[in-house]
Structures are given as C-alpha cells and as structure tokens.
C-alpha cells in the first residue's frame, strides 16, 4: 500500500479528477484525493494524497498559492476563459500605465464572485453543472486575499498581458481576468493559466505523469526527509534536517526512511548518481511538518488505533482542542485533539504494523 503525497504537475486538458484517476492507475491503488481543484485548461501544481495520506487533506495548509497567467483583452466569455462563448466585446486596448493602476484595486482583501462555471456548490450542486444545464447560477460574492499581483509582460499588438499572482485560498484567477477587464472597460478572459505553488508544494519539486509512467515508483531506499526543525544531520551523504517531539520535548533527531528518491533539506527532489529518479512520494510525516508532533509508546498507540482516548503527561503547552499528530518513532499514528486533558484520536492512520 502506498501512503504519502505526490506533488503532481498536472497538464492542460485534464481535470483534477481525471489526474487522480491516472495516478491511481499508475500506483495501483484505490484511495487517492487532491488538495485544491485545478481547472482542466490550467496546468501546474496539484497535490495528490495517496492511501492513508487522504486523511490529512483537511489539515494541510494551502493558504498561499501562486499563479502565472495570460489575459486576452477585448472579449468576455461565459466561462471567463478560452472554453466559453463570447458574450461581450470591446475595441479598447489598455495601456501599460492603465493596467498597472487598475491592478492596485485587486491587491489585499477584496470581494470576488466566482465564475458561473466553477466548482462552487449551490444547494448541493456544482455551479458548473447547473450552468451547463442552462440554469441561472446565482453565486454569492466572498472575501478573498491577494498578496501580490504584478503585470510582467504586455503585448499591445496581440492585446494580451502576462501576470504573476500570490494569493490566499478561494481565489479564482478567471474572476480576476473578468473583473480587471470590466474595470478597464475592455473586457478580458484567461488564455493561459499555470499554478506554481500550493502551500509547501512548489513547481521545482513537482513530477509529471509522463515521468511517473516511465519510472519505477515503488523502489525503497534509506534516504531521508525533513520534519520541522533547523537542525541538520547527514543521511547517506545528503544534508537533511528533521526532529520530532517526545512528550512535548523536542530532544531527538528523527530521520524518516522514504522512497528513493527523497527530498533535499530545502524540500526539493533528489536524484541518484545515475540520474534515475525513482521515488516521488512525500511521506505523511513530512507533509504534516508544520503540525505539532508528540511521540507515544506502542501500548498507547494501540489504544489510539482502537479509537480510545489516552492521557499523556507533559503536554502543558497544548490548549483545549489543539490539533497535533501522535507518532511512534517516525511512523504517524493519528491526528488527535487535546480535549480536557485527554488525547482524543480524530483520524487514525492504518500504517503501524
């Protein structure tokens, strides 16, 4: 059974669900899920949880996302991208200073209405399904945050502009194109969209479906991955970092055996001397590196695996309802909450043998 995360570089022309289906087939597994949805016409980072890692999806931070995209001015479409029908046109060609002035209104906390063709749920149904059936879709605007929005290229001949953006969760790039076009009175839609970051998942550490189909993805080696301290230690000649907490005391180094290849101390993929990249799985422990970890005994682990609550000493730093991960050695046991002095299992990992 494969358990861990995959930092997938999704190609264009494939939905997020289709990407997950292909990954299931490649790894021969039945359970997988993705963190955040990426439009079929978009490419880039789509983190995919495999096996028991699917239980960690709600606990992974994806508050920061990064995108590169191109807007074509002069046309607004039903889908706010190339795939829709044209509904409004304009002959206006916005100038460099006009665009730079307009994008200032899109930085910070803004109110944004998702596209009609989006995965937003309306009374239990996806908005895009309602829109495709011809129903009128009424999507409520919501507050989102844009940390950075820059125009990096303007082609006045072809009437297109390239942008880079760092934003919070829930932002629709297609809505940015739509609203910016309306602001400039020239209309606009997305022609290219690429996501380069989702939380800790970065573009330069990703893998493509083509790479996965060519390489052996189930070869193990004793290489190591990071957890969450600034303490460095060598493992098989590679500088790595990692530590775990034992009863709330960070006093031991924890080295995590992972698939060959592993990650570097900076989080990037490593390759063996022959350049044969064999392993792309990020262990559950590493994906949860920002979550507080507490080591427990095998006896305590068995109780938690059965859904029983336990009492642990020396958890004074935890507040009521704090979430943390219990581990035995380097093996995650469960995501737990600290409730009125008890350690209560929320999601138990079926990994420990």
Swiss-Prot record:
Keywords: Isomerase, tRNA processing. One of its GO terms (molecular function) is RNA binding. It catalyses: uridine(55) in tRNA = pseudouridine(55) in tRNA. InterPro entries: PsdUridine_synth_cat_dom_sf, PsdUridine_synth_N, tRNA_psdUridine_synth_TruB, TruB_C. One of its GO terms (biological process) is mRNA pseudouridine synthesis. SUPFAM superfamilies: Pseudouridine synthase. CDD domains: PseudoU_synth_EcTruB. The active site is at residue 39. It holds the Pfam family TruB_N. Belongs to the pseudouridine synthase TruB family. Type 1 subfamily. This is tRNA pseudouridine synthase B. The gene is truB.
